[in-house]
Amino acid sequence: MLSSIKCVLVGDSAVGKTSLLVRFTSETFPEAYKPTVYENTGVDVLMDGIQISLGLWDTAGNDAFRSIRPLSYQQADVVLMCYSVANHNSFLNLKNKWIGEVRSNLPCTPVLVVATQTDQREVGPHRASCVNAIEGKRLAQDVRAKGYLECSALSNRGVQQVFECAVRTAVNQARRRNRRRFFSINECKIL
């Protein structure tokens, strides 16, 4: 079982990656938007009675930081590809930009697609044009993500589930990897 997990969040600028992290780690919501360049934090989480150190790496969505983003990918155990339901371009960019960047740096690391700012479907000025869950699930299948989740950092809906799923996905991937290693080392050969 992993004792520490590195979780990297990617996606366009202003889709709510930092707000999601702040809500999860401090149970508050940042009122002012502050663009991220590169930030990481950590929290201890319990999964099935086992304490795991969860490292959270927030990346800049701005293309100006494309050259330094790969530094945050090193040895990641799981990636959260985030888009805002109120920003259709951020949704399209998961398929047109982010999955390619993630797969070229982390070809075997599990990816989860995370729809953020779901509160905008109910109260936002863009509610009629918001990306719906069916479109999000289809995108997750298209990019071969391990899962699709929705959340709102503002209303604190689905936030905990996003990180529980990230931890469980990373742990399950490590178990599969260890099982493959065990069987490849201990193969029986009939001569």
From Swiss-Prot:
Any Gene Ontology CC annotation: cytoplasm
PTM entry text: Phosphorylated on tyrosine by LCK. Phosphorylated by FYN. Phosphorylation enhances the interactions with ZAP70 and SYK and is critical for its function in thymocyte development.
Residue numbers bearing the Cysteine methyl ester modification: C188
Region called Interaction with ZAP70, residue ranges: 73-86
Lineage, top ranks: Eukaryota, Metazoa, Chordata, Craniata, Vertebrata
Record protein name field: Rho-related GTP-binding protein RhoH
Signal peptide: none
Residues with a covalently attached lipid (S-geranylgeranyl cysteine): C188
Species this chain originates from: Bos taurus
